[in-house]
Amino acid sequence: EELNKIGINYIQDALFLLPKKYENRTKLTSIKDLTPGEAFQFEGEILESKTIFPGRRSFMARISDGTGFLQIRLFYFSFAQAKAFKVGLHVRGYGVIRTNGSLLQVFHPSYKIFASSKRPVLDNTLTPIYSLGSTKLTQFRARNIIKECLKEIEELNLNEKEIDSIFKQQKISSLSVKDALLKIHSPSVEDDIIKINSYKHEAQERLIV
Protein backbone atom coordinates (compact mmCIF):
# COMPACT_ATOMS: atom_id res chain seq x y z
CA GLU A 1 0.00 0.00 0.00
CA GLU A 2 2.83 2.43 0.86
CA LEU A 3 4.49 1.58 -2.46
CA ASN A 4 1.26 2.28 -4.34
CA LYS A 5 1.18 5.79 -2.86
CA ILE A 6 4.35 6.68 -4.76
CA GLY A 7 3.27 4.94 -7.96
CA ILE A 8 5.09 1.63 -7.52
CA ASN A 9 2.99 -1.31 -8.70
CA TYR A 10 5.49 -3.28 -10.79
CA ILE A 11 9.25 -3.94 -10.81
CA GLN A 12 9.85 -1.35 -13.54
CA ASP A 13 8.06 1.29 -11.44
CA ALA A 14 10.56 0.74 -8.61
CA LEU A 15 13.54 0.78 -10.96
CA PHE A 16 12.41 4.07 -12.48
CA LEU A 17 11.99 5.74 -9.10
CA LEU A 18 15.17 7.69 -9.78
CA PRO A 19 17.12 9.16 -6.82
CA LYS A 20 16.63 12.87 -6.14
CA LYS A 21 20.14 13.16 -4.67
CA TYR A 22 23.02 11.15 -3.24
CA GLU A 23 24.95 11.05 0.03
CA ASN A 24 28.61 10.09 0.29
CA ARG A 25 28.82 7.45 3.00
CA THR A 26 31.97 5.87 1.62
CA LYS A 27 34.21 7.61 4.16
CA LEU A 28 34.27 8.75 7.78
CA THR A 29 35.17 12.23 8.96
CA SER A 30 36.85 12.73 12.35
CA ILE A 31 34.73 14.75 14.78
CA LYS A 32 37.46 17.40 14.99
CA ASP A 33 37.13 17.93 11.22
CA LEU A 34 33.32 18.28 11.12
CA THR A 35 32.21 21.60 9.61
CA PRO A 36 28.89 23.19 10.75
CA GLY A 37 26.33 23.53 7.98
CA GLU A 38 27.62 20.56 5.99
CA ALA A 39 26.63 16.87 6.00
CA PHE A 40 29.17 14.26 7.08
CA GLN A 41 29.41 10.63 8.09
CA PHE A 42 30.83 10.28 11.60
CA GLU A 43 31.45 7.55 14.14
CA GLY A 44 32.11 7.39 17.85
CA GLU A 45 31.65 5.62 21.16
CA ILE A 46 28.52 6.43 23.17
CA LEU A 47 29.65 8.14 26.39
CA GLU A 48 26.29 9.33 27.68
CA SER A 49 22.62 9.05 26.72
CA LYS A 50 19.47 10.40 28.32
CA THR A 51 15.96 11.67 27.74
CA ILE A 52 15.68 15.37 28.56
CA PHE A 53 12.81 16.95 30.52
CA PRO A 54 11.13 19.38 31.22
CA GLY A 55 9.98 21.41 28.25
CA ARG A 56 10.00 19.77 24.87
CA ARG A 57 10.88 16.12 25.38
CA SER A 58 14.07 15.20 23.56
CA PHE A 59 16.82 12.60 23.57
CA MET A 60 20.54 13.29 23.76
CA ALA A 61 23.53 11.03 23.21
CA ARG A 62 27.12 12.25 23.53
CA ILE A 63 29.76 10.43 21.49
CA SER A 64 33.51 10.69 20.94
CA ASP A 65 35.98 9.26 18.44
CA GLY A 66 39.02 10.38 20.41
CA THR A 67 39.39 13.61 18.42
CA GLY A 68 36.40 15.48 19.81
CA PHE A 69 32.82 15.24 21.06
CA LEU A 70 29.49 15.30 19.20
CA GLN A 71 25.97 15.46 20.59
CA ILE A 72 23.21 13.54 18.81
CA ARG A 73 19.72 15.00 19.39
CA LEU A 74 16.38 13.35 18.66
CA PHE A 75 13.06 15.16 19.14
CA TYR A 76 10.82 12.43 17.72
CA PHE A 77 11.83 9.05 19.09
CA SER A 78 10.52 5.87 20.64
CA PHE A 79 11.47 4.25 23.93
CA ALA A 80 13.21 1.48 21.95
CA GLN A 81 15.31 4.03 20.05
CA ALA A 82 16.45 5.73 23.25
CA LYS A 83 17.17 2.40 24.93
CA ALA A 84 19.39 1.29 22.01
CA PHE A 85 21.93 4.06 22.74
CA LYS A 86 23.79 2.13 25.42
CA VAL A 87 26.97 3.58 26.88
CA GLY A 88 29.98 1.70 25.51
CA LEU A 89 28.42 0.84 22.18
CA HIS A 90 29.42 2.66 19.01
CA VAL A 91 27.30 4.65 16.57
CA ARG A 92 27.89 5.58 12.95
CA GLY A 93 25.71 8.39 11.64
CA TYR A 94 25.17 10.77 8.77
CA GLY A 95 23.67 14.23 9.04
CA VAL A 96 24.12 17.99 8.88
CA ILE A 97 26.38 19.32 11.63
CA ARG A 98 25.21 22.24 13.81
CA THR A 99 26.72 24.23 16.64
CA ASN A 100 25.35 25.38 19.98
CA GLY A 101 28.08 27.64 21.29
CA SER A 102 31.22 25.51 21.20
CA LEU A 103 29.16 22.29 21.17
CA LEU A 104 28.87 20.28 17.95
CA GLN A 105 25.43 18.75 17.41
CA VAL A 106 23.52 16.75 14.82
CA PHE A 107 19.72 16.50 14.79
CA HIS A 108 17.98 13.32 13.65
CA PRO A 109 20.87 11.75 11.75
CA SER A 110 20.48 8.41 10.02
CA TYR A 111 22.51 6.03 12.18
CA LYS A 112 23.59 2.48 13.03
CA ILE A 113 24.49 1.30 16.53
CA PHE A 114 26.97 -1.55 16.92
CA ALA A 115 29.50 -3.18 19.23
CA SER A 116 33.14 -2.36 18.52
CA SER A 117 33.73 -6.02 17.55
CA LYS A 118 31.00 -5.82 14.87
CA ARG A 119 31.96 -2.64 13.06
CA PRO A 120 30.06 -2.42 9.74
CA VAL A 121 32.00 -1.97 6.51
CA LEU A 122 31.75 1.38 4.75
CA ASP A 123 29.61 1.68 1.63
CA ASN A 124 31.56 1.48 -1.63
CA THR A 125 29.04 3.48 -3.67
CA LEU A 126 27.14 6.72 -3.16
CA THR A 127 23.89 6.32 -1.21
CA PRO A 128 20.74 7.21 -3.20
CA ILE A 129 17.98 9.30 -1.60
CA TYR A 130 14.48 8.91 -3.05
CA SER A 131 11.38 11.11 -3.05
CA LEU A 132 8.98 9.18 -0.82
CA GLY A 133 6.41 11.89 -0.09
CA SER A 134 4.42 11.43 3.11
CA THR A 135 4.54 7.62 3.04
CA LYS A 136 5.77 5.57 5.98
CA LEU A 137 8.34 3.98 3.68
CA THR A 138 11.88 4.64 4.93
CA GLN A 139 14.90 5.36 2.74
CA PHE A 140 16.49 2.13 4.01
CA ARG A 141 13.44 0.09 2.98
CA ALA A 142 13.19 1.83 -0.41
CA ARG A 143 16.85 1.08 -1.14
CA ASN A 144 16.38 -2.58 -0.23
CA ILE A 145 13.30 -2.90 -2.46
CA ILE A 146 15.15 -1.40 -5.42
CA LYS A 147 18.19 -3.64 -4.78
CA GLU A 148 15.91 -6.68 -4.91
CA CYS A 149 14.34 -5.44 -8.17
CA LEU A 150 17.81 -4.94 -9.68
CA LYS A 151 18.72 -8.49 -8.64
CA GLU A 152 15.58 -9.81 -10.28
CA ILE A 153 16.42 -8.10 -13.58
CA GLU A 154 19.95 -9.53 -13.32
CA GLU A 155 18.70 -13.05 -12.60
CA LEU A 156 16.21 -12.97 -15.49
CA ASN A 157 19.25 -12.56 -17.77
CA LEU A 158 17.22 -10.63 -20.34
CA ASN A 159 18.96 -9.30 -23.40
CA GLU A 160 18.91 -5.62 -24.35
CA LYS A 161 15.99 -5.93 -26.78
CA GLU A 162 13.85 -7.71 -24.21
CA ILE A 163 14.60 -5.08 -21.57
CA ASP A 164 13.96 -2.27 -24.04
CA SER A 165 10.60 -3.81 -24.91
CA ILE A 166 9.68 -3.93 -21.22
CA PHE A 167 10.62 -0.29 -20.60
CA LYS A 168 9.71 0.97 -24.11
CA GLN A 169 12.91 3.00 -24.26
CA GLN A 170 14.91 4.19 -27.25
CA LYS A 171 18.67 3.72 -27.11
CA ILE A 172 20.23 7.16 -26.64
CA SER A 173 23.43 6.14 -24.84
CA SER A 174 26.22 3.59 -25.12
CA LEU A 175 25.05 2.11 -21.79
CA SER A 176 22.59 -0.77 -21.70
CA VAL A 177 19.38 -0.23 -19.71
CA LYS A 178 20.60 -2.71 -17.11
CA ASP A 179 23.96 -0.96 -16.68
CA ALA A 180 22.28 2.45 -16.57
CA LEU A 181 19.91 1.29 -13.83
CA LEU A 182 22.75 -0.18 -11.78
CA LYS A 183 24.81 2.99 -12.14
CA ILE A 184 22.00 5.43 -11.37
CA HIS A 185 20.89 3.55 -8.22
CA SER A 186 24.45 3.01 -6.93
CA PRO A 187 26.97 5.33 -8.60
CA SER A 188 30.61 5.07 -7.61
CA VAL A 189 32.44 7.94 -5.93
CA GLU A 190 34.31 8.43 -9.22
CA ASP A 191 31.08 9.28 -11.07
CA ASP A 192 30.54 12.95 -11.87
CA ILE A 193 28.17 14.04 -9.07
CA ILE A 194 27.64 17.45 -10.72
CA LYS A 195 26.39 15.78 -13.89
CA ILE A 196 24.22 13.40 -11.85
CA ASN A 197 22.64 16.22 -9.84
CA SER A 198 21.88 18.16 -13.03
CA TYR A 199 20.48 15.02 -14.74
CA LYS A 200 23.20 15.09 -17.41
CA HIS A 201 24.95 11.83 -16.57
CA GLU A 202 24.92 9.27 -19.39
CA ALA A 203 23.08 6.76 -17.17
CA GLN A 204 20.24 9.27 -16.70
CA GLU A 205 20.21 10.13 -20.39
CA ARG A 206 19.85 6.42 -21.12
CA LEU A 207 16.78 6.18 -18.90
CA ILE A 208 15.05 9.55 -19.27
CA VAL A 209 13.24 10.22 -22.54
What does each model-found stretch correspond to?
Residues 1-9, 14:
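Helix-hairpin-helix
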Residues 17-47:
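OB-fold nucleic-acid-binding modules
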Residues 52-59, 64-209:
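Upstream accessory/linker segments immediately N-terminal to the RecA-like ATPase cores of bacterial MutS
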Residues 11, 39-41, 69:
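A common structural microfeature
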Residues 10, 27-31, 176:
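Short, solvent-exposed coil/turn linker segments
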